[in-house]
């Protein structure tokens, strides 16, 4: 019997790779006349399939042996129409038998324990064959991050009861606050806000919510993968039927596409929920990195980390992403802890996506860091190696986040908008997507994801309140914090790169000062649609800035000349001011932008460059650009805590 350390030595040998690397299909291959199951299990002595009628409970209908083929692949053919039938594998390795689901399962029963054979076209939504990924112009590429659960859990959201917290909530049109017919919520709200993409926190099958129990008190963000190619059952209206979660997930995607909104999937291939999972039960120790003593490396901070550099692990990751892109028409992928993947895997995946029809439009970006020390001994897909990554693989820029609002690990640490001394120097770096700074390696401005809040750490509103007050009143409509919120938005939404915001940032979302709510109560995590109506002025401010940004494409340009064209003014500290001319022929609404940031509590006077300048946003109203606002020249006044934007006419 091999020790974990001996398995590690074997798996990292060139001989093992040569004998077991396989490039063909794996998982179920369905036809009406029969289904072939293929499983890669090169270390197994014996493999059998267990057949079930149901996804939970019920006796096994029978067990059949799989036949061993070359390169570690086992297979069995099941005659007849197998759609809707469930199965597991029993894999015997080194004298130990493991019963497990199929790592390549397309759907599953309750809690993902039994895989289900699926004839996808049979259960697809009407007109699914006509659905397609949305082509979002670069100037509209703003990402709004939300959990399926949070989106519609609020009883006041107007969504029918059976769909609250589910995929189907994204399909209901005409919802309003408390169904009163006034303030739009959910899908209608999103369409009005004007974001280009919705980034969905994990929608694959995760293990931290029990699908067999009511969800009244259960909650988790879902960064606990169980089945990578299966939609999460708790987000469906019936987790006992494997086809329902697939159909309803596709209905959600089709609805967002019909609204002109792309769908980005938050993927967590860097670790799995438990070591007892389909990958580790099929080929123990292969898919996860190990320490020299054979124990699991824990660069994820969650107990294990995926070995993307091993050939069949790399194949699995790429196969899975391509499956979601093709079968579910996903518009982009956000990689959790991307620093745990090797550069070669990420670049190979980017090339594979590019090879799909219109695949170059699929977004790909991630967190360029790890959750702890790792046994990855290849180049990591992190900030330090940004130059090695494809120019179309983006990164979350914590430099931008921290300089604007302050560090995320110290609740009281201020940033530029809260008056941190000296921080104005780095605001210029953020504006130019750090292309003119030595704080990041050489990169394209479009690789930078500019943001100030995401699901991790404090919401922007809570951070602002924690810096301002010893005992914050989080639900209060604090005028100074509102002004700082507008300033923060005014900065990152005028930075080069791709903007990103946490759902609800635009209406002062609060989690009452809690910075890590991954398993807190549903009521704390859900979007508060009454608060959205209460802070409708802030919502309109974000909406106006999103529209303004779309009118000036050069802010979203990918060429090196664009950040180089930004001219910064010499102003009294801590004011920041700059201009950027429009690129020739890019269809911009103005010949140039001129932007000033004032992080003080006082009005400030500055001088505009020569020429005529239309006031587009004064830091309170961001929709002035839509109407006949005044044309300025000479000296102008900046409001306290404001981002003031002018367009040259």
Please tell me what each predicted stretch does.
Residues 29-45, 565-608:
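Carbohydrate-binding surface patches
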Residues 118, 350-351, 355-507, 514-518, ...:
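Conserved alpha/beta catalytic core and glycan-binding cleft of carbohydrate-active enzymes
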Residues 149-328, 337-357, 363, 374-375:
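Substrate-binding/active-site clefts of carbohydrate-active enzymes
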Residues 19-24, 485, 494-514, 524-593:
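Glycan-recognition and catalytic regions of carbohydrate-active enzymes
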Residues 52, 477, 481, 527, ...:
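C-terminal accessory region downstream of the catalytic core in glycan-modifying enzymes
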Residues 39, 89, 146, 200, ...:
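Conserved, mostly hydrophobic/aromatic
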Residues 41, 84-87, 628-649:
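C-terminal beta-strand-rich structural cap/linker in extracellular carbohydrate-active enzymes
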Residues 1-32, 68-172:
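The feature marks proteins involved in alpha-glucan
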């Amino acid at each position: 019997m091999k020790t974990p350390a001996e398995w590690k030595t074997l798996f990292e040998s060139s001989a093992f790779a040569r004998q077991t690397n396989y490039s063909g299909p794996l998982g179920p291959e369905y036809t009406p006349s029969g289904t072939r199951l293929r499983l890669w299990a090169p270390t197994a002595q014996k493999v059998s399939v267990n057949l079930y009628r149901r996804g939970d409970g019920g006796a096994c209908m029978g067990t059949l042996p799989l036949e061993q083929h070359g390169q570690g692949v086992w297979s069995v053919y099941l005659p007849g129409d197998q759609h809707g039938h469930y199965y597991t594998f029993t894999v015997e390795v080194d004298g130990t038998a493991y019963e497990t689901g199929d790592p390549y399962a397309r759907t599953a029963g309750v809690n993902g324990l039994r895989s289900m054979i699926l004839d996808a076209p049979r259960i697809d939504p009407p007109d699914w064959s006509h659905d397609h990924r949305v082509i979002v112009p670069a100037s509209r590429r703003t990402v709004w991050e939300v959990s399926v659960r949070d989106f519609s859990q609020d009883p006041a959201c107007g969504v029918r009861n059976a769909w609250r917290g589910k995929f189907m909530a994204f399909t209901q049109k005409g919802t309003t606050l408390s169904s009163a017919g006034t303030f739009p919520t959910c899908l209608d709200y999103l369409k009005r806000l004007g974001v280009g993409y919705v980034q969905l926190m994990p929608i694959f099958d995760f293990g931290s919510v029990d699908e067999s129990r009511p969800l009244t008190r259960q909650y988790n963000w879902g960064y606990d993968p169980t089945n990578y190619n299966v939609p999460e059952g708790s987000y469906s209206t019936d987790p006992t039927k494997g086809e329902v979660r697939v159909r309803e997930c596709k209905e959600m995607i089709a609805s967002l596409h019909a609204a002109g909104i792309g769908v980005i999937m938050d993927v967590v291939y860097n670790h799995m929920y438990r070591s007892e999972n389909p990958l580790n039960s099929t080929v123990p120790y292969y898919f996860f990195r190990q320490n020299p003593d054979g124990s699991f490396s824990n660069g994820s901070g969650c107990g294990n980390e995926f070995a993307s550099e091993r050939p069949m692990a790399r194949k699995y990751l790429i196969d899975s992403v391509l499956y979601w892109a093709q079968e579910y028409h996903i518009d982009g992928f956000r990689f959790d802890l991307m620093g745990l993947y090797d550069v070669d895997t990420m670049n190979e995946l980017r090339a594979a996506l590019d090879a799909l029809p219109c695949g170059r439009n699929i977004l790909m970006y991630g967190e360029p860091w790890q959750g702890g020390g790792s046994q990855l001994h290849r180049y990591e897909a992190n900030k330090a190696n940004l130059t090695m990554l494809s120019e179309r693989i983006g990164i979350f820029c914590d430099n931008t986040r921290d300089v604007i609002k302050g560090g995320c690990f110290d609740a009281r640490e201020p940033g530029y908008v809260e008056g941190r001394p000296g921080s104005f120097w780095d605001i210029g770096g953020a504006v130019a997507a750090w292309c003119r700074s030595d704080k990041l390696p050489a990169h394209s401005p479009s690789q930078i994801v500019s943001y100030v809040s995401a699901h991790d750490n404090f919401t922007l509103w809570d951070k602002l309140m924690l810096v301002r007050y010893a005992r914050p009143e989080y639900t209060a409509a604090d005028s100074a914090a509102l002004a700082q919120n507008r300033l923060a938005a005014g900065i990152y939404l005028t930075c080069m790169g791709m903007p990103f915001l946490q759902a609800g940032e635009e209406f002062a979302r609060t989690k009452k000062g809690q910075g890590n709510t991954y398993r807190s109560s549903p009521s704390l995590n859900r979007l508060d649609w009454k608060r959205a109506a209460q802070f409708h002025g802030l919502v309109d401010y974000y909406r106006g800035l999103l529209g303004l940004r779309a009118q000036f494409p050069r802010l979203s340009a990918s060429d090196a000349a664009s950040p180089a064209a930004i001219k910064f003014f010499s102003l009294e500290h801590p004011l920041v001011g700059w201009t950027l001319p429009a690129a020739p022929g890019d269809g911009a609404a103005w010949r140039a932008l001129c932007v000033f940031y004032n992080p003080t509590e006082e009005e400030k006077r500055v001088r505009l460059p020569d020429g005529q300048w239309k006031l587009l946003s004064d830091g309170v109203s961001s929709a002035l650009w839509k109407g006949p606002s005044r044309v300025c020249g000479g000296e102008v006044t900046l409001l306290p805590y404001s981002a003031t934007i002018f367009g040259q006419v």
